[in-house]
Amino acid sequence: MMNDIKVMNHAADNIRILAASMVEKANSGHPGGAMGGSDFINVLFSEYLVYDPADPTWTGRDRFFLDPGHMSPMLYAGLALRGFFSMEDLKQFRQWGSVTPGHPELDLERGIENSSGPLGQGHALAAGAAVAEKFLEARLGSTMMQHKIYAYISDGAVEEEISQGVGRIAGNLGLNNLIMFYDSNDIQLSTECGVVMNEDTEMKYKAWGWNVIKINGNDVAQIREALDAAQKEQDRPTLIIGKTVMGKGALRADGTSYEACINTHGAPLGGDAYVNTIKHLGGDPENAFVIFDDVKEIYAKRAEELKKIVAERKAAEAEWRKANPEKAALMDEWFSGKAPKVDWSKVEQKAGSATRAASAACLGVLAEQVPNMICASADLSNSDKTDGFLKKTKSIVRGDFSGAFFQAGVAELTMADMCIGMMLHGGVVAAMGTFFVFSDYMKPAVRIAALMQVPVKFIWTHDAFRVGEDGPTHEPVEQEAQIRLMEKLKNHAGKDSVRVFRPADADETTVCWKLAMENVETPTALIFSRQGIAKLPEGTDYEQAAKGAYIVAGSDENPDVILVASGSEVSTLEAGCEALRADGIKVRVVSAPSEGLFRGQSKEYQESVLPKNAKIFGMTAGLPVTLEGLVGANGKVWGLESFGFSAPYKVLDEKLGYTGENVYKQVKAFLAEA
């Protein structure tokens, strides 16, 4: 039985009061949108969302993804009514050390499924979670996977380019488990939305294959009706376009309406406007941080309903476990967060192959041995060699999620965020590929994954100017330096925010993939070559790659000079060693696939590989700064300082100085400087 509409409106006003008061107390934040969206949040949280208050991480729960993170006061207030936050927590909004930061940060124990703020990404995460739920349902059945994924978006998210990718993919896959509320209040931070957009959003989503329902987003009955219809939808994702009022219930200092005003979007109501608003909504400005008694009742009632719903679901789950012990064991393993078990001896590598081809060999084994892994590509599977995975499975398509390859189309950012969302859902391991130069499209997703500590795998191929004939638009130069900065940035757990690997040959690629799959704490970036790379000298202990940098076999004792690189430049350094040794120069070659891992080793180990006072020469196909931290103050780096050029890659090697002969020449000159 549904709650009385008067009480529901009172509850929405309670959320409005709390949201406005949080912003007012912090003297910082966004009250207007939060006040406008309170009706939907209240209906969803008090009557529809299925979760276990006593077990917030229950795998069978519905998931709610907020996209406009600036509307955090609405989320925190709604979660406070559910018992996840105290009034003291709300009072500490945006303060040091509080559990209520300005934009929500992933916190499953308090009901927050995703960090949000950069507009557009939140609903892409939700779409990814919806794919994961369908993928797992195909393997485990509907008893264990029957939940819904709810997303909440704003005008800003619709304007963001990523909404195109999410709209297309979710519609194409028929994600009927995805229900998205579009808070359409026609106001944004600096203008009314009509200044920058005049499209028919309803028709746009219908064209993508969505079920679109348009309602008054502040009307309880219409919200219920829309949610009922969305839950019954069998073939399409649903977009509920709720026309809401920015700053609903707000009054100015003079007592006139402050609704639908740009000013309420991103600043406290302030002074008498705040006082008038709280009184108008039925609160006490002197004691605003309270939950009304009748509101407590409806949420207590929902908690009791949920006990019954969850008990029935968990009983059914227990029966399923008895009937399906092997699947149950798999499910527990998949949701454990532990690294999957892989027999890496099954990987067969071909000496001299491109590391992208070596990656394909690893992916083929992963496709066979990790049944909960999803691999994706942005329309490049036959080039980035994620087809090594695809050849052992099939693509995920509408109506059939038994495959494990996610075809994203040309949408790198959408693909990345959806893969992150798959992992946020839980139960899956996600990896995705594209050209390294197009990692630029993905940077916002890399950052949000790093912030949330989601161990997704980024596969970036065609790693340098050796892309060749395609020319500078497709030849990464600055990209490696950019992503390696993320190795230096720490997450809130004190770990390197992203683990980065650029292996030197096929066998080192296997070790790097092993390390990537074992890394369950942070995202991993794997950077691979387009062209074949000579095998490192016989006897090289590839397992040492786990230390980030290590001495390659055949290196001399007490070297006069140390040569260091990652990727294909290691073999280029090796090519210059013979001539250097013929001149009586003792040489050590160091492969450094991961500077971040290397910096995490003991000072003694670091000193044993790259002594501080040694003469160190580095070679990188990227910017010199990529290696300057490793060569140190006495070192020298040969790198690119311009964009690349269009020509066969062997011609570019000659023209740009990436040959054994130039290594000899540059090292001799470097040593002569002493």
Describe the function of each predicted region.
Residues 151-152, 180, 376, 617:
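Residue-level marker for buried hydrophobic side chains located in beta-strands
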Residues 67, 154-155, 218, 411, ...:
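Structured loop/turn residues at secondary-structure junctions
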Residues 156-162:
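Short acidic, Gly/Ser-rich segments with clustered Asp/Glu that frequently serve as metal-coordination loops
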Residues 1-148, 297, 301-527, 532-534, ...:
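Thiamine diphosphate
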Residues 5, 65, 156, 191-192, ...:
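A generic secondary-structure micro-motif detector
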Residues 278-309:
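Non-catalytic, alpha-helical, charged scaffold/linker segments
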